[in-house]
Amino acid sequence: MNKDVFEGKWKQMRGQAKDWWGKLTDDDLDRVGGKYDKFVGLLQEKYGYTREHAEAEIDRRVKDVKEAVKKA
């Protein structure tokens, strides 16, 4: 997935990230600041994901956000 797409959709995703990944806090999300690599690392840290698993989860959520925007 393109890092630019993630970073461009961050504002839409940030609000839902805590619903998707309940272990994340506002401080965690502030620390990430919409940076793809930092978010991947955060998911690895909090959930024990491999890099590939974290990227796949993010890709899935970005697609969900893109679809929701298209329908709106």
Residue ranges of predicted features:
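Intrinsically disordered, low-complexity, hydrophilic segments
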Residues: 1-72
